[in-house]
Amino acid sequence: MNTAQSKLHEAAMRIFAERGATQLNVSELAQAAGVARGTVYNNLKAPETLFEEVAANLADEMHRRISASSAGIDDPAARLSVGLRLFVRRAHEEPHWGRFIVRFAYSNMALQGVWAGPPAMDLQHGVATGRYAFEPGKFVSLLAVIGGSCLSAMFLVLEGHKTWREAGSDAVEFALRGLGLSPEEAAAIANTELPPLSR
């Protein structure tokens, strides 16, 4: 993605998050991005598909960045802790990004895929290695509960009810306890130092 496309995607994400709508017009996008209308036409395939492009790029980007940030961490519980807390911290650092995720995570297929990447793989690995104790038939429900916990933590941060550290650690602790870890171990893993989100 070139610089102009990145700028347009960023502006579109802000507009979508603020309005809650999945459509926008070229003029408002150009104004929000601080570019000419011609720049929009020259850098986007089809403005009417911009929402889907932004959502898909966002999901792919977070998968890549979280995977890089948790490289070298073998324990599935520690990887889950890092991944969930990175989502919550990023919502604090980039509120428009967080609002976009919270607003559209359940209604957009590309964003639903956020939970199908590293979080799902870490859950499967945890089951396969005996780290987690839950029935395999409940995998999809468990993934939904963990995703919902993450979104709720992001919401608490965006609304100013909790700090990102508190909300992220609480969500991880509850998720790990639900996966069968002891309260003490879940709390310890949920409060480990968080690595930076890779670029």
Please name every model-derived segment:
Residues M1-V35, T49-E52, D60:
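Basic, helix-initiating cap at the start of DNA-binding domains
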Residues A4, P47, V54, L58, ...:
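Hydrophobic/aromatic residues within well-ordered alpha-helical segments
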Residues A21-T22, K45, Y132-A133, K162:
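Conserved hydrophobic residue
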Residues A33-L44:
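Short hydrophobic/aromatic patch on the recognition helix
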Residues E53, R64-W97, S107, G168:
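Hydrophobic alpha-helical connector segments
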Residues H63, V82, A105-L151, F155:
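Amphipathic alpha-helical packing segments from all-alpha helical-bundle domains
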Residues L86-A110, A116, A120-V127, A187-L194:
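Amphipathic alpha-helical segments used for helix-helix packing
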Residues M121-T129, E159-R199:
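C-terminal peripheral helix-coil segments that are non-catalytic and often amphipathic
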